[in-house]
Amino acid sequence: MKRIGLLGGSFDPVHLAHLALARAAAAELRLDSVQLIPAANPWQRAPLRASAGHRLRMIELAIDGEPQLAVNPVELERGGPTYTIDTVRALPADAHYVWLLGTDQLANFCTWRQWQAIAGHVDLAVAARPGAPLAAPAELASWLAAHRRRLIRLPFSPMAISASDIRGRLARGASTAGLLPATVARYIARHGLYR
């Protein structure tokens, strides 16, 4: 059975830290592939700046030539509010799935709609600084223990890259060198995004 990592996000825009995390997950967790899942309308976030079509195309450009990385447009195709539970329920049953989280997402995981069902459908891998403690919220820790499940640690040193910083730089006309794949930077410039 294939092992597939799932990395959800707004990808507004996709940047080098997203790609580094996906590559690290594929290698460290021995995944057959990692799917980047752009959100249609994330319920816990501010409105997105780039259209779904632009965000999807930027991901396609960013992962071109990386066979272990793929884009899964399931949330864009569904439209409306984006809930992870709907996404995991729509996944084909012929693979084992690992949902990739950051420590910030882990801290508020129990606020996600039907979080227990999500944790029952997929394994949870948390990108954490090597050597840093990995602490699940008490409610999640209790649920995991009761269901004989555990968090998977994904050693990953955080990178000082954020989509909001990139959008700010682009709006000011500042450099984004070292933050975006070159193909994505060219696409953004060609389409005048984030100005």
From Swiss-Prot:
Catalytic activity: nicotinate beta-D-ribonucleotide + ATP + H(+) = deamido-NAD(+) + diphosphate
CDD domains: NMNAT (cd02165)
Originating gene: nadD
Keywords: ATP-binding, NAD, Nucleotide-binding, Nucleotidyltransferase, Pyridine nucleotide biosynthesis, Transferase
Enzyme Commission number: 2.7.7.18
Protein name in UniProt: Probable nicotinate-nucleotide adenylyltransferase
HAMAP family listed in its UniProt record: NaMN_adenylyltr (MF_00244)
An example Gene Ontology biological process: NAD biosynthetic process
General function of this protein: Catalyzes the reversible adenylation of nicotinate mononucleotide (NaMN) to nicotinic acid adenine dinucleotide (NaAD).
Organism: Bordetella petrii (strain ATCC BAA-461 / DSM 12804 / CCUG 43448)
Pathway linked to the protein: Cofactor biosynthesis; NAD(+) biosynthesis; deamido-NAD(+) from nicotinate D-ribonucleotide: step 1/1
GO molecular function, one term: nicotinate-nucleotide adenylyltransferase activity
